[in-house]
């Protein structure tokens, strides 16, 4: 299937909303993808994507906007929630599991249960929440690396639509604060060795699809690398580079 508007093959055209997948609200425990082993099981490839970050930075809004094309009208703190869909990547089915976690301190002991078999982390902070950005390196990276030393991380700046919001800027100014500069966020991504840094908005859906496209590709690469025989490890980088280009172009539909 040819690339669609909003695909990485079309730089600067990431505003298009994704095609909504089927959604299954998880009813099992925080770490349960529906069975044993990695997400997807033996019948097909699977990617388990875990969203982490401070409370109220918009993690749930990202998931809801991506999976339903809707937007939550009120803030309800998340405990733990699972969403899943089957996506077509390079002509093969991939089960995408999204684990939305609670950022509040009272869930610090429970939250790591969601990290089991994680293929990719979306580490979220609000671009208009300096304290949430500070916690990226002070709290979240150490927590992730304690439980998943090698899993890739994508740093995500949420609520980008509020960067120029006058009311938000006034409130920040009262506290002698400013929005997080994009340059500072990119530098942070380099320091924590994140796969990439992407700013997005769940409300306008700008760069929203790009965030989850990147998560799927990075998650598949990581999952494959964990299963690669050691003897073929030296050939992995070139092979994955070729495949990732194909996936970026062809990942554009849900089934």
Curated annotation (Swiss-Prot):
Post-translational modification: Tyrosine phosphorylated by SRC in response to PTK2B/PYK2 activation.
Keywords: Cell junction, Cell membrane, Cell projection, Golgi apparatus, GTP-binding, Isopeptide bond, Lipoprotein, Magnesium, Membrane, Metal-binding, Nucleotide-binding, Palmitate, Phosphoprotein, Ubl conjugation
Membrane association type: Lipid-anchor
InterPro entries given in the database record: P-loop_NTPase, Small_GTP-bd, Small_GTPase, Small_GTPase_Rho
Alphabetized CDD domains for the sequence: Wrch_1
Covalent lipid sites (S-palmitoyl cysteine): 253
Compartment annotation: Cell membrane; Golgi apparatus membrane; Cell junction, Focal adhesion; Cell projection, Podosome
Function recorded in the entry: Binds to and activates protein kinase PAK1. Plays a role in the regulation of cell morphology, cytoskeletal organization and focal adhesion assembly during cell migration. Also stimulates quiescent cells to reenter the cell cycle. Has no detectable GTPase activity but its high intrinsic guanine nucleotide exchange activity suggests it is constitutively GTP-bound.
Listed PANTHER family: RHO FAMILY GTPASE
Subunit relationships: Interacts with PAK1. Interacts with PAK3. Interacts with ARHGAP30 in a GTP-independent manner. In its GTP-loaded conformation, interacts with ARHGAP31. Interacts with PTK2B/PYK2. Interacts with PAK4; interaction protects RHOU from ubiquitination and subsequent degradation.
Protein name in the entry: Rho-related GTP-binding protein RhoU
Source species: Bos taurus
């Amino acid at each position: 299937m040819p690339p669609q508007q909003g695909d990485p093959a079309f730089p600067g055209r990431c505003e298009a909303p994704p095609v909504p997948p089927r959604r299954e609200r998880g009813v099992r425990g925080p770490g349960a993808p529906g069975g044993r082993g990695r997400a997807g099981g033996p019948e097909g490839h699977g990617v388990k994507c875990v969203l982490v970050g401070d409370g109220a930075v918009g993690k749930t809004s990202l998931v809801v906007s991506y999976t339903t094309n809707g937007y939550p009208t009120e803030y309800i703190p998340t405990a733990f929630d699972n969403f899943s869909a089957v996506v077509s990547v390079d002509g093969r089915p991939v089960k995408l599991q999204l684990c939305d976690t609670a950022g509040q301190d009272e869930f610090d002991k429970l939250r790591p249960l969601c990290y089991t078999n994680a293929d990719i982390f979306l580490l979220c902070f609000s671009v208009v929440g300096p304290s949430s950005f500070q916690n990226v390196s002070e709290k979240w990276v150490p927590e992730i690396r304690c439980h998943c030393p090698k899993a890739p991380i994508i740093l995500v700046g949420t609520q980008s639509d509020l960067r120029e919001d006058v009311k938000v800027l006034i409130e920040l100014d009262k506290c002698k604060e400013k929005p997080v500069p994009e340059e500072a966020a990119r530098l942070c991504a380099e320091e924590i060795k994140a796969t990439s840094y992407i700013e997005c908005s769940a409300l306008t859906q700008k760069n929203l699809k790009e965030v989850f496209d990147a998560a799927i590709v990075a998650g598949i690469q990581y999952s494959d690398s964990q299963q690669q025989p050691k003897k073929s490890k030296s050939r992995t980088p070139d092979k994955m580079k070729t495949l990732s280009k194909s996936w970026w172009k062809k990942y554009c539909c849900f089934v």
